[in-house]
């Protein structure tokens, strides 16, 4: 249903629709020529599983991010340990205890990756999909051939869709700038996070982007081209990848992204989408 609606939207605008199959049943959606384009504007369209805790990301504070991941992993161990303890009390078979432990691990992994879909996903990643579609609708006709818009599948399962895309278009992606929007809807601090390769090889381009990001009112759009900045999403699969995301700010954690993967993911600010759309249009236009 989703792919059909997106196809109708794109074809009404004059784009050619295509699908590419990838690993584990991934189906990436494309508008434009993936071999000739200079830019890929991307977002993932798959829906994450509903979890009892958010995916808490602190891009500029790796210590807090890793600590949170460790705590979550330990919480996952609790039901496994309880199940193993009960099995040990109810049976004297070491094999039964071992199978119980492995069974619980497999079940928890399945729930994490393939469990009931989170019906509230305004930020992750309805916001990114809207951005891609908005840019398609507003990009001047003369710039369209420079851009291939791609909606990746199976990002939540481990960047599967984008990895499949990269494998299929190995030569083209070496030179293409990949602008990947993920979770841009909730927060006043919007970051463009370029890859290490892009920082090293094209610092002048990043400096020009900073002028495009200036003057955004109460919201800020920043090119984060110095220091550690971690945001796990599809841009990580590309040498010239740029992650684009929105964050809130606190004195305790610095910039952070929360609520996603839970029923509380209900915020997607239109202004965020508009700001990012205009910045990306400027980036594409500067090379015209």
Regions found by a protein language model. Give the residues of each.
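A non-catalytic alpha/beta surface segment that caps or lines the substrate-entry region
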Residues: 1-36, 50-88
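Acidic/histidine-rich catalytic neighborhood of metal-dependent amide-processing enzymes
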Residues: 2-12, 24-27, 84-89, 93-203, ...
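Sequence-level motif detector for i,i+2 pairs with an aromatic at +2
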Residues: 26, 36, 174-176, 239, ...
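Short beta-strand element of the alpha/beta-hydrolase
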Residues: 38-43
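Short glycine-enriched loops at secondary-structure junctions
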Residues: 44-47, 100-103, 183-184, 246-252
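Short acidic, S/G/P-rich loop/turn micro-motifs used as interaction or catalytic elements
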Residues: 46-49, 157
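Short alpha-helix boundary/capping segments
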Residues: 59-66, 120-124, 268-272
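Active-site-adjacent substrate-binding region
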Residues: 187-288
């Amino acid at each position: 249903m989703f792919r059909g609606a997106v196809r109708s939207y794109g074809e009404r605008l004059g784009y050619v629709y295509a699908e590419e199959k990838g690993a584990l049943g991934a189906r990436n959606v494309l508008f434009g020529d993936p071999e000739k384009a200079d830019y890929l504007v991307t977002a993932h369209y798959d829906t994450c599983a509903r979890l009892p805790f958010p995916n808490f990301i602190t891009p500029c504070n790796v210590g807090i991010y890793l600590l949170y991941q460790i705590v979550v992993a330990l919480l996952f161990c609790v039901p496994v340990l309880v199940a193993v303890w009960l099995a040990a009390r109810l049976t004297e078979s070491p094999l039964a205890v071992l199978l119980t432990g492995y069974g619980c691990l497999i079940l928890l992994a399945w729930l994490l990756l393939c469990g009931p879909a989170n019906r509230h996903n305004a930020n992750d990643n309805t916001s990114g999909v809207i951005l891609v579609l908005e840019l398609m609708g507003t990009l001047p006709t003369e710039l369209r051939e420079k851009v291939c818009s791609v909606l990746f599948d199976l990002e939540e399962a481990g960047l599967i869709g984008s990895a499949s895309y990269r494998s299929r278009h190995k030569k083209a992606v070496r030179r293409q700038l990949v602008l990947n929007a993920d979770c841009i809807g909730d927060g006043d601090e919007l970051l463009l996070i370029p890859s290490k390769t892009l920082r090293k090889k094209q610092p002048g381009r990043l400096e020009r982007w900073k002028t495009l990001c200036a003057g955004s009112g109460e919201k800020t759009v920043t090119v984060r081209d110095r220091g550690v900045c971690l945001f796990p999403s599809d841009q990580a699969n590309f040498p010239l990848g740029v992650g684009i995301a929105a964050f809130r700010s606190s004195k305790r954690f610095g910039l952070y992204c929360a609520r996603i993967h839970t029923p509380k993911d209900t915020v997607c600010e239109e202004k965020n989408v508009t700001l990012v759309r205009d910045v990306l249009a400027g980036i594409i236009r500067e090379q015209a």
